[in-house]
């Protein structure tokens, strides 16, 4: 199976399976001389780690990361990148493959079981193998490295919708995101989601979600016309995350409801001589190139396909049957997708910054300034 690598200059290759001995990634193309600590990578992983609330899978994985290549000890503490491939490894410690023994020959509705089997002639029934969201832990680790390539850039994400219940954007407070198990920026929505998800969980069902990712401090000039568009790469990055079924940039699909006057981001010249935008319907990207405004994207995550409700399916011999998926699963997998979305934004921006430097050789700036 190929296509395990993402990026052009800042390249991330992941490996390992959900129920294998370990998962890992190789980050290639990271510039030398960047300082970081294992604790910084671990802190990012801890935000995604399973088993932290009753609303995520109860699989107990500590996700302790090891840096096995590409760095040296820095004299002042921590590590420094050498410019060679950075290897990151996490051992799996809480696999329960026996939970899947009864359905080894059955295709779980909504999962990649049938398509993997049709393409490769075999599949890993133990938690889905490579198709499991377990793989995304390594994306988060890679994102922590990518952040070091992007000084001055802040990437944050939040959950804005679970099922039919959406936050009140007028109450958006980034400080609240780390204060609840949902990464929710609206404190008044937290108890509503709590009751709602408790009901979903007790029924043995699941529900989808929407995540919004915002990157601030992104310089103008990242991205390229036509086939190297920043927003195209962001869309590909988010769509590569397990269970993601839709992506929008800026105003997204809502732009189809607006007039040209409403959607256009008008510009003025500030007192410093630099132009600025009066709005950001474009989500910080015009013509595939960053404008200097915050880059804003959203992606939709479908309900977890593994549920306790019996569903009709077939086995590999074509026999119809009722299937109940055992094991430990997220009632809303979108919750833990929040740090994954941040990581993919970071990896794309790091890649595009290095590509910009390689092609243009300068730091992106506004094209006109007053002396």
UniProtKB/Swiss-Prot annotation:
CDD domains documented for this protein: Chorismate_synthase
PROSITE patterns: CHORISMATE_SYNTHASE_1, CHORISMATE_SYNTHASE_2, CHORISMATE_SYNTHASE_3
Pathway: Metabolic intermediate biosynthesis; chorismate biosynthesis; chorismate from D-erythrose 4-phosphate and phosphoenolpyruvate: step 7/7
Enzyme class: lyase
Gene Ontology MF, one: FMN binding
One term under GO cellular component: cytosol
Catalytic activity, reaction form: 5-O-(1-carboxyvinyl)-3-phosphoshikimate = chorismate + phosphate
Lyase as UniProt keyword: yes
Function noted in UniProt: This reaction introduces a second double bond into the aromatic ring system.
Family indicated by similarity: Belongs to the chorismate synthase family.
Quaternary structure and interacting proteins, as annotated: Homotetramer.
Stated name of the protein: Chorismate synthase
Species in which this protein is naturally found: Azorhizobium caulinodans (strain ATCC 43989 / DSM 5975 / JCM 20966 / LMG 6465 / NBRC 14845 / NCIMB 13405 / ORS 571)
């Amino acid at each position: 199976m190929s296509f395990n690598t993402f990026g052009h200059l800042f390249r991330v290759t992941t490996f390992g399976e959900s129920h294998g001995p370990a998962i890992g990634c190789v980050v290639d193309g990271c510039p030398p001389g960047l300082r970081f600590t294992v604790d910084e990578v671990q802190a990012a992983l801890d935000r995604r780690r399973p088993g932290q609330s009753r609303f995520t899978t109860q699989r107990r994985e500590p996700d302790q990361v090891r840096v096995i290549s590409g760095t040296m000890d820095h004299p002042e503490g921590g590590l420094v990148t050498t410019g060679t491939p950075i290897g990151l490894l996490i051992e799996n410690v809480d696999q329960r493959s026996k939970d899947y023994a009864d359905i080894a020959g059955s295709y779980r509705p909504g999962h990649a079981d049938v398509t993997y089997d049709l393409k490769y002639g075999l599949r890993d029934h133990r938690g889905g193998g490579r198709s499991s969201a377990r793989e995304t832990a390594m994306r988060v680790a890679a994102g922590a490295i990518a952040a070091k390539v992007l000084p001055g850039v802040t990437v944050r994400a939040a959950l804005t919708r679970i099922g039919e219940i959406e936050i009140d954007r007028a109450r958006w407070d980034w400080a609240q995101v780390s204060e609840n198990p949902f990464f929710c920026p609206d404190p008044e929505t937290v108890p509503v989601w709590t009751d709602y998800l408790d009901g979903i969980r007790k029924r043995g069902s699941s529900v989808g979600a929407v995540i919004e990712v915002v990157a601030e401090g992104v310089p103008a000039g990242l991205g390229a016309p036509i086939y190297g568009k920043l927003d195209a790469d962001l869309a590909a990055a988010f769509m590569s995350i397990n269970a993601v079924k839709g992506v929008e940039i800026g105003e997204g699909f809502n732009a189809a409801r607006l007039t040209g006057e409403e959607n256009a981001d008008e510009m003025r010249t500030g007192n410093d001589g630099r132009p600025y935008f009066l709005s950001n319907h474009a989500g910080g990207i015009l013509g595939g190139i960053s404008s200097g405004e915050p880059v804003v994207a959203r992606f939709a995550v479908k309900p977890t396909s593994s549920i306790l409700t019996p569903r009709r399916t077939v086995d590999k011999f074509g026999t119809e049957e009722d299937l109940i998926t055992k094991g430990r699963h997220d009632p809303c997998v979108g919750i833990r997708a929040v740090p994954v979305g941040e990581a993919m934004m970071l990896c794309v921006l790091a890649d595009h910054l290095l590509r910009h430097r390689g092609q243009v050789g300068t730091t992106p700036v506004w094209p006109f300034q007053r002396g």
